[in-house]
Amino acid sequence: MSYNITNSNQYQYFAAVWAEPTPMLNQCVSALSQSYQTQAGRDTVRQQFANLLSTIVAPNQRFPDTGFRVYVNSAVIKPLYEALMKSFDTRNRIIETEEESRPSASEVANATQRVDDATVAIRSQIQLLLNELSNGHGYMNRAEFEAILPWTTAPAT
């Protein structure tokens, strides 16, 4: 018994692009209250989002028979998830000084504004992702999955 792969683009479903719905929603809610003033803080939350993803199906491992999973490669979720992950990476863009050990007042003000802008961007992307998940976008269950990629059983003997 296995999935009947008929198109090369079907291999994407076997990658680590799935998340459990409740932990994903909880992570969004939790992340909205985080402080993003340091790159280490942004990296931590980015890693928490990345850690939610896993593989749940393989060519010979069937989609779970109960519940839904978030498919982050869905047309609605993918651009939001990618934008969120990109918004966390502000390394080397926050403070750019001519002499790193003694930034000028304007460089410090500029860096502060960039941190504030990064925080707004991160929270905005999290809220957009949370809204779409709350509206039921990006979820798949076994029936929906197997409409795309049929499960074949061995012939009866």
Curated annotation (Swiss-Prot):
Transmembrane annotation, as ranges = none
Its chief place of residence is virion
The record's annotation in Pfam families points to: TMV_coat
The molecular function GO annotations come to: structural molecule activity
UniProt key word Acetylation: yes
Cellular compartments per GO CC: helical viral capsid
| SUPFAM superfamilies in the cross-refs | TMV-like viral coat proteins
Q: Which residues carry this modification: N-acetylserine?
A: 2
* Keywords, in A-Z order: Acetylation, Capsid protein, Helical capsid protein, Virion
**Keyword check for Manganese:** no
Against Gene3D superfamilies, the record matches this protein to:
Tobacco mosaic virus-like, coat protein
Please give the superkingdom of this protein's source.
Viruses
Q: Where in the cell is it found?
A: Virion
State the InterPro entries in the record.
TMV-like_coat, TMV-like_coat_sf
The entry assigns this protein to a family as follows: Belongs to the virgaviridae capsid protein family.
Main role?
Answer: Capsid protein self-assembles to form rod-shaped virions about 18 nm in diameter with a central canal enclosing the viral genomic RNA.
Q: What protein am I looking at? A: Capsid protein
Q: Which organism is it from?
A: Ribgrass mosaic virus (strain Hr) (RMV)
Gene field: CP
